[in-house]
UniProtKB/Swiss-Prot annotation:
Cited function: Responsible for the degradation of GM2 gangliosides, and a variety of other molecules containing terminal N-acetyl hexosamines. Degrades chitotriose.
Species in which this protein is naturally found: Caenorhabditis briggsae
Disulfide linkage: none
Keyword Zinc annotated: no
Glycosylation site list: N44, N348, N409, N457
UniProt lineage: Eukaryota, Metazoa, Ecdysozoa, Nematoda, Chromadorea
Catalytic activity: Hydrolysis of terminal non-reducing N-acetyl-D-hexosamine residues in N-acetyl-beta-D-hexosaminides
Residues the record marks as active site: E322 (proton donor)
Gene that this sequence comes from: hex-1
Major place of residence: other
Designated name of the protein: Beta-hexosaminidase A
Amino acid sequence: MRLIVLSLLFTSTLAWFYGRDEPDRWSVGGVWPLPQKIIYGSKNRTLTYDKIGIDLGDKKDCDVLLAMADNYMNKWLFPYPVEMKTGGTEDFIITVTVKEECPGGPPVHGASEEYLLRVSVSEAVINAQTVWGALRAMETLSHLVFYDQKSQEYQIRTAEIFDKPRFPVRGIMIDSSRHFLSLNVIKRQLEIMSMNKLNVLHWHLVDSESFPYTSQKFPELHGVGAYSPRHVYSREDISEVIAFARLRGIRVIPEFDLPGHTSSWKGRKGFLTECFDEKGEETFLPNLVDPMNDANFDFLAEFLEEVTETFPDQFLHLGGDEVSDYIVECWVRNKKIRKFMDEKGFGNNTVLLENYFFEKLFSIVEKLKLKRKPIFWQEVFDNNIPDPNSIIHIWKGNTHEEIYEQVKNITSKNFPVIVSACWYLNYIKYGADWRDEIRGTAPSNSRYYYCDPTSFNGTDTQKNLVLGGIAAIWGELVDNTNIEARLWPRASAAAERLWSPAEKTQKAENAWPRMHELRCRLVSRGYRIQPNNNPDYCPFEFDEPPATKSEL
């Protein structure tokens, strides 16, 4: 009896210390992100591999749905490393009905992802307007499937679900300039994105450190700017990523940051300004575009035409952040630039020179043959005169309240916004930062689950201008070896915030049993998903392939 009492006392003390319950408390057949409306039935249905099928109806030739059926039937519905039972008594057919035709290209902004899913003991029925909605429904259905340890059987919960996303933009930003990311690693993140119902990959392709994008028209860019000839993405590589993303209902938005963060563009002669230190000596690292040279704008026009031919998405991210970090060295101390400013009547006002550059860039974007809606980081709004057609990408704010004030200010000027400031996942501290405020970090760099981009005092018109959010993972200390575990499941907190109803997702303590089940589900599917709720375990843990004999 004494041992039992001590054990109970120790367990409850741990629960208090970690701020959570027992480490095996997870939901069973819980859906992540939480649907708009879900009603569970009272019965479960045993599933066996030989008695389950998918009926695509009149869309049986649609490549998106065929890939979906293959992925779920052969990998994701039955992910656990257990012997599959066969010989069920009745077939279980998943019937998929999609109203619109199978699209030939990737999803477009605002495409419907709404679906209705009904699961009974005899069948499952999916109804969706688009194939993208059907993809989301199938992922939800897979969350209803669980492995019962006692009966050693796969079962599915019966349920009726109506669902659609809260925001049209729900994404991840990856940075392949600071550290090159392989195609396989990028594809793995796309798979996990689809399992979290995220639909935008913001690809920060180039930055000061390297230029891995292969330009067919201007091969000198990657020829000089890439880390090595191996650290590049060919047009075929990019097309492969876009095609892979499409089959999972994900758009790919490229970013080419201008006019700063451009050291790696050094292969283009005359594109960058000369920069000088306090003694007037030229520095080795120019990092701003030379706005004096009209040939640079001709080059950008041709270069961006090529980019739009490579990336089909209607959004194009053109950066615009942190220009002020380089202005003194590269513009103020540059005598040629100062003379140009005098000739233009700008005096000492470098903001006017920035405006000059951006006006030229806006004109280039407006004249693109394949029309694009530009996205800019928020400095272009804060310091300059943004094109009225622009989307403003918010990355600043030390608290959630400061972030909300930024959103309020920008939307009050009638600009649509995308929010990333809440979810900078490259910042790491010890603890469950998805739900807790972590000591030593700004609140915006923790408590990811609690950031709601529309939690500001504004009009409905303003709140409708909030397109959604993108969780960012900057690459200074992130590469192929750690991006997956660092992203997931922390990005899953943002995924639920951007998909699910705000009023139903107010408390992380109510969400973490579902997140625990999500983590274990993804681990069983073969992904490196780090612990997120302090001490816990999964029924089937992640494992590496066995060592070869030579390693023993």
